[in-house]
Amino acid sequence: MKKGHESSSRIPAGPLRSPDGSHDPRSRAPLPVGERIGADTKHTGRGITAAFLDSGFYAHPDLTTPHTRIHAYYDLMSGKSGLEPLEHPDASSWHGMMSSVVAAGNGALSNGRFKSLAPDLGLVLCKVGTLSRVHHDDIARGIEWVILNRARYDIRILNISAGGDYEASYLDDVMSRFAEAAVRAGICVVAAVGNRGDKPGYVVPPASVPAVITVGGLDDAGNPSFGRVTGYRSSFGPTIDGLQKPEIITLADWIPAPILPNTPTSKQVQLLAKLHRASDEEIPKILDKHAGTYAPLDEARHQPVYLL
């Protein structure tokens, strides 16, 4: 967890504040999720273990500092297990890293500011896809693996931030049957409804399963006090079985989330942070030194500093 964390740099002091202490609308920095929804901080997930199915994962410091809360990792695609692969992320790791840290991160890299709603939650991570695809049948296999390992890791929650390849009735779809079986086994299954709000009535398994708690989204512009709460592009029912989904909507945009180390995005963020701290005299030299990192800055680097 030493090298490769440069892009997960510590967050400076929080967003701008008005004289009365409220969030200053001039600041683009979003408030932490807990502040935005008025979460009760006494509920931290302590003693609870949740499993996550996603395309890949990374052992982010917010999950491993001061001690790891990742109890197990299983790669369904290769059959490999053990925590060591989490130290070497690839491009497929970003989505699961974000979903797990947003759900269970303790804010270690932001001095606790951007901690999740469940900073003490234990995790079991199961990779069920690649960067390009998460297949319907692989999600089903992942749910089956969680059921088989429920007692071993005391799994009480299953989060699925992926969806199947097609609409299907929960009465005869294999993935849907596994999701129902997980609930019968005592696991609370939660699934994202999907991002097909442009296609009404399109909800795929596992989000379409009656026993699954399905979650959609809203956009509060980063702060509810702005008074600009709008709908997100979430999918919505009725499902192919005539069921209304989702059951819950919550924040889906302006979510403080980590960036995967050693990726083009992480290098761009490091450059922007360096420029933010630099004096006017230092900025041209920094831009020349990091040419090729971020195309918009390459195009603008010969302009006067005050125009950047």
Tell where the protein language model's regions lie, with residue ranges:
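Generic secondary-structure signature for well-ordered alpha-helical cores
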Residues: 2-6, 10, 16, 108, ...
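Short, glycine/charged-enriched secondary-structure capping and boundary segments
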Residues: 64-68, 172-175, 204-207, 229-230, ...
